[in-house]
Regions:
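N-terminal active-site segment of His-dependent metallophosphoesterases
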Residues: 1-49
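Active-site-proximal beta-strand elements of phosphoester/diester hydrolases
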Residues: 3-11, 128-135, 213-215
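Catalytic phosphate/metal-binding cores of nucleic-acid and nucleotide-processing enzymes, i.e., regions
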Residues: 6-7, 14-18, 75-78, 100, ...
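Divalent metal-coordination and catalytic microenvironments
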Residues: 9, 35, 50, 61-62, ...
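Active-site environment of divalent metal-dependent phosphoester hydrolases
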Residues: 11-15, 38-41, 65-68, 138-139, ...
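His/acidic metal-ligating clusters that form di-metal
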Residues: 104-189
Length: 251
């Protein structure tokens, strides 16, 4: 039976993706919720594989957004603003990407620019699963996002929504969200600044009355990631980069 999964925020941790890829069958579908690049050493390789893999539905994250924003300037020798990308872990990506021919870099930029900001999956239980990188406050309608001109920034950068309640409107009664972007320790402590715990007992976090699930385990710091079954939101598989953990696996 075909399965549908979601994972997110692998940040160049290729060994984790390799495990996920081998775990999933050829006929499965994998929603990747953004942030393949930056911080870790193999972000470019990971992005290329995700774009090529027919099982993967790739959704843009804020780090893909930063890449497509700054790389065109870097190719022209303009380094204004580059420090912002570096602060967000972009140096490893640029050092790797700059080794490729410019034609291929431009091709990759075009492919990343095409990535959607969100997707909706109706699972086998009839639940409507809204998938995006950062998650969002569903109390805002799409039209309100358009009027504010911030739809893309909200869907890939927003963290304020973690304080919002699920909409009471009848049309949202069967809607759920799965997202990444905010590492679970941040969300648990209601911190909007980087905060990472050790990976012991670090798991995907269901919150907002069970309507939202955060699957970002901060894998660059914890070497642990989550793969959630979108047809059974209680079924989450965890993967570890044992090499990064020094051979020690955490529960």
């Amino acid at each position: 039976m075909n399965k549908t999964y979601a994972c997110s925020d692998l940040h160049g941790m290729y060994n984790l993706w390799k495990q996920i890829s081998e775990y999933c069958d050829d006929t499965d579908t994998i929603y990747f919720l953004g942030d393949a690049c930056d911080r870790g050493p193999n972000g470019v390789k990971l992005m290329i594989e995700l774009l090529k893999d027919p099982r993967v539905k790739y959704i843009k994250g804020n780090h893909e957004d930063l890449l497509t924003l700054y790389v065109p300037y870097l190719l022209e020798g303009h380094f204004d603003g580059y420090s912002h990308w570096v602060m967000n872990g972009g140096e490893t990506t640029w050092n790797d990407l700059s080794k490729f021919p410019e034609e291929y870099i431009l091709f990759l930029l075009r492919e990343l620019d095409k990535l959607p900001l969100s997707a909706t999956y109706i699972n086998k239980q009839g639940q409507e699963i809204f998938l995006s990188h950062a998650g969002t406050d569903l109390n805002y309608t799409k039209r309100e996002y358009e009027l504010r001109g911030k739809a893309s920034k909200y869907l890939i950068w927003d963290r304020d929504h973690i304080f919002a309640d699920h909409p009471t409107d009848e049309k949202f009664k069967n809607v759920y969200q799965v997202h990444g972007h905010t590492p679970v320790p941040n969300l648990e402590h209601k911190l909007l600044i980087p905060f990472y715990s050790k990976p012991q007992k670090l798991e995907a976090l269901s919150y907002c009355g069970g309507r939202k699930i955060d699957i970002d385990l901060g894998c660059f710091s914890t070497a642990k990631t989550a793969l959630i079954d979108l047809d059974d939101l209680t079924n989450v598989k965890y993967f570890y980069d044992l090499e990064a953990l020094g051979g020690e696996k955490y529960d």
